[in-house]
Amino acid sequence: MDLINQFIDNYKKKFNYYESLGRLAAGQLEAVLRSSGIRAMVTYRAKNPGRLKSKVLRRNVKRPVPYRNIKEIYEDIADLCGVRVSLYFPGDRLQADQLIRDQFHILESKQFPEQSKPPTYHKRFSGYWANHYRVYLREELVQPSEKRYCRARIEIQVASVLMHAWSEVEHDLIYKPLQGTLSKEELAILDELNGLVLAGEIALERLQAAGNERIRSKNAVFNNQYFSLSFQKEGYHSRPGLACAVRSGPAG
């Protein structure tokens, strides 16, 4: 049996471990996001063995020196356990970033978009907007029975709900095309969809800002009404021409 098949067989035995790790990390993320008032969907997965084998084969071909042992493959593949945070509002990315840095031990972080190689099609839009993190669980934040999960890496991806949906479509079409590489027309359509997603993100940011402003306005009205009612209850009254007048002495 060749090395890559040996690795896949070994990984299959550890699949439940990585799935449990993802469940634990996702649970932590859900809790801190909820307590901070960030609306998001949090999902997790252990990497599918079939997809993992395809990825390892691709990476092995591109390496200057092929994998020499199973340990090398484990060290090279960072997303055996993955957690995805799909934000309802893209404007929450910065706050989510700080929460992740507080909750996990960060090995590496990367912000997209980035341009790693010249594209075959010149994009008009900027592509994938997201933050990726490679992390470990913090030992002080898990139960004693869960400390064994602190030894494995987790990849966390944070993007808007819209961006994650577009990314899934693009990834499957580009990396797993049914027949050959995509044509310029297909790439142009993907680019067009990306533009619609980016426009949607702007709309979501405006929606969030409008909602926050509405809440602030309602709170301001409530506070003013409460302030006025309190004064009247205690015998204080506003005078004509003044927004509010406070008089000293006992209520009479």
Region spans (language model):
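Charge-rich, low-complexity segments
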Residues: 1-80, 87, 91, 220, ...
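An acidic, glycine-/histidine-flanked metal-binding catalytic module
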Residues: 1-17, 150-252
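Long beta-strand-rich cores associated with HINT superfamily self-processing modules
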Residues: 74, 86-206
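Short, charged low-complexity intrinsically disordered segments located at boundaries
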Residues: 52-63, 126-134, 225-237
